[in-house]
Amino acid sequence: MKNIKIVRILKHDEAIRIEHRISELYSDEFGVVYAGNHLIFNWYQRLYLSRNILISKKSKSRKGLIQMIFIIGICTVFLIIYGIWEQRCHQKRLNSIPIRVNINGIRGKSTVTRLITGVVQEAKYKTVGKTTGTSARMIYWFTDEEQPIKRRKEGPNIGEQRRVVKEAADLEAEALICECMAVQPDYQIIFQNKMIQANVGVIVNVLEDHMDVMGPTLDEVAEAFTATIPYNGHLVTIESEYLDYFKEVAEERNTKVIVADNSRISEEFLRKFDYMVFPDNASLALAVAEALGIDEETAFRGMLNAHPDPGAMRITRFADQSKPAFFVNGFAANDPSSTLRIWERVDDFGYSNLAPIVIMNCRPDRVDRTEQFARDVLPYIKAEIVIAIGETTAPITSAFEKGDIPTQEYWNLEGWSTSEIMSRMRPYLKNRIVYGVGNIHGAAEPLIDMIMEEQIGKKQAKVI
């Protein structure tokens, strides 16, 4: 073997793509069997036998080649055996948890996950909930303390679901409520069919987001979400243009469809929450309760007892103590539908009458979103002042000059620092509603931090 010399000359982008796929699918030494023996064979073929690997002339002897194939064969057999064993262990753990719910969609998944967790827990099931995203949390029935999920350097990975299932099984949980963490359609299939095998699937909504992965159209997004529809179980979703499509897929899978009914959710009930809850959020949780045979009274009580997500929407009082301004952080709701929906809730509570200031944060790498907001959002919010911050604000300026944005004043503060923006706004921050929209990253994050520093009475913050 001393004369064998192997040199990899994979093209850089190809190597990254292969290694990323292997990292995604084989994270934590899990699921080798999931990918199938074909992929394993191809991987080793690429590594040792393909045109992308050069074997020096000295190593081309028959003996060296046989030794190499033998080692590859041993490693492959070991990985397959380990993968099968791990798969069986994982399946045994899943089978020990009778209620498994998978929540998918674009907006509001975390809130719906928490509401459902609260409902099932209130019904006296030993319940474990899991939210994903930047504030991923584990929620347990036996304590009010939530456990932040610590992720490795590679970031979120569907392989972490194995650890979640193991922990839930070790705790002898009776219900596992999980927010789907997969975005790519293939991974959504793996998440449902291998990782959680939910018997209740929830599709919160179908909106434009991650179109580079799930798109290019909403039809493809809806198709991707069909991975959430279980076999021989329940699908819970809302009224939408894709409802009939989801029903067809559910029928093929012998799954019962329950359509969330917003008429069962009163405004009085929604006002009891100390954070923003949309009617859809609550009606979806109520529909899951129906699927699980949980009575309505228990379901409503469980929703109210559910803990809010760290990123839950609130109206924050800040600036002047006697005549405060009220801040609504909608920067992260980066699509027109969600942004306008939040504003509708603000209007329901009467805040839209407080001489609104709308702050539009623009990014140079999201010009298409800036143009979309100039066309589909800002014309429909009656603001007294519209402020453009960040970079590449030209689409907003152009829309204002054309008369498309109905506002008394327009401030183009492109490139201004956070302190300069606050100084410019400060004389106007009395008895006003301030609504941030567009993009969370860039100029918005430090502005939010500065506003939070001026928050008046954290416990007195009004919620929507």
From Swiss-Prot:
The keyword Flavoprotein does not apply. Pathway: Capsule biogenesis; capsule polysaccharide biosynthesis. It is found in: Cell membrane. One of its GO terms (molecular function) is ATP binding. It comes from the Bacteria. Induction: Capsule synthesis is transcriptionally regulated by AtxA, AcpA and AcpB. Keywords: Capsule biogenesis/degradation, Cell membrane, Membrane, Plasmid, Transmembrane, Transmembrane helix, Virulence. The chain crosses the membrane at residues 65-85. One of its GO terms (biological process) is capsule polysaccharide biosynthetic process. GO terms for cellular component: plasma membrane. The gene is capB. Coiled coil: none annotated. This is Capsule biosynthesis protein CapB.
